[in-house]
Amino acid sequence: APPLGRHSTIVFGGTSTLHPPKCNWQPTRKYCCFLSHYKNEAGSDARDLRDLLQRMANAPVFLDSSDLADLKRLFTDGVQQSDVLVVLGTKGVLTRPWCLLELWEAHTQGVPIIFVTVEGRGFDFGDAKHFASHFTEELEVANPGALELVEKGLRQQGATVDDLAAALALLLDAA
């Protein structure tokens, strides 16, 4: 399993994003990172962060809306080809089937996972831990029908919702 437990908060704006510090990122895969996000809550933040990270690292960042034409290849061409999975923490990110499956894919493929809380978007680690500890019930209430999609995606990988819930709890406890 990948190293877990990295957490940060990001606020956009100001001069630091206009002229960010540079680093010499040496990617081991095609992308320095994969940005996992709930488009309705953090779509513009994800685009801004992608642009910022690409300038800082001088390396490509995977963002599904710009780098993928076929969602079936999201895992093989996205998550598996990224050095790190960055989850943009917003209120509903853990209720989205694709975001959950991206987390699972990263977990099973040994891709490190970092949570970045997007300020002002309602993410709370306490709420997220409660959600993970009552995963099946909470997911169905928060996003009716999502559980079925997640179960289907996990089944194709030989996994269960309980496996995902345990990995999610581990990730959130380490953050």
Regions found by a protein language model. Give the residues of each.
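Short acidic-hydrophobic, aromatic-tinged amphipathic segments that line or gate anion-handling sites
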Residues: A175
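Conserved N-terminal substructure of TIR/SEFIR domains
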Residues: A1-V93, P97-G126, E140-L172
